[in-house]
Curated annotation (Swiss-Prot):
Part of the 50S ribosomal subunit. The keyword DNA repair does not apply. One of its GO terms (cellular component) is plastid. It comes from Paulinella chromatophora. Keywords: Organellar chromatophore, Plastid, Ribonucleoprotein, Ribosomal protein, RNA-binding, rRNA-binding. This is Large ribosomal subunit protein uL24c. The keyword rRNA-binding applies. It is found in: Plastid, Organellar chromatophore. One of its GO terms (biological process) is translation. PANTHER family: MITOCHONDRIAL RIBOSOMAL PROTEIN L24. The gene is rpl24. It comes from the Eukaryota.
Length: 118
């Protein structure tokens, strides 16, 4: 009789070139074309939250006696493969490359424009 061993998902951290604070453009999905700032990243799941993109509506019940119920709209996670870094100066989305300057420091740069990201 064969023993079945389930595949275990590794909790390895995925290298993401997009970081918190970057300006990105959504390249696929229902919010395609939208531009926003990255608010939070989840490197273990390769996901991120972008300001004003992938909004979800939730109906919240009142918690105390005098309070009324409300509708809350907040951003949900996006997969990192659905976004690209965006240059606000040149109005173009681009991939990110890692370059090493003369001092040996690694910097992120947009491939299309050559703009260095902070």
């Amino acid at each position: 009789m064969a023993i079945i061993i389930p595949k275990v998902k590794t909790n390895g951290r995925i290298k993401m070139r997009i970081r918190k604070g970057d300006i990105i453009q959504v390249i696929s999905g229902k919010d395609k074309g939208k531009i926003g700032e990255v608010l939070r990243t989840l490197p273990n799941e390769n996901r991120l939250i972008v300001e004003g993109v992938n909004l979800r509506t939730r109906h919240v019940k009142p918690t105390s006696g005098g309070e009324s119920g409300r509708i809350v709209t907040k951003e949900a996670y996006l997969h990192a493969s659905n976004v690209m870094a965006y240059s606000t100066e040149n109005k173009v989305a681009s991939r990110i490359e890692i370059m090493v300057d003369s001092d040996g420091n690694r910097k992120r740069r947009l491939k299309k424009t050559g703009e260095i990201l902070a």
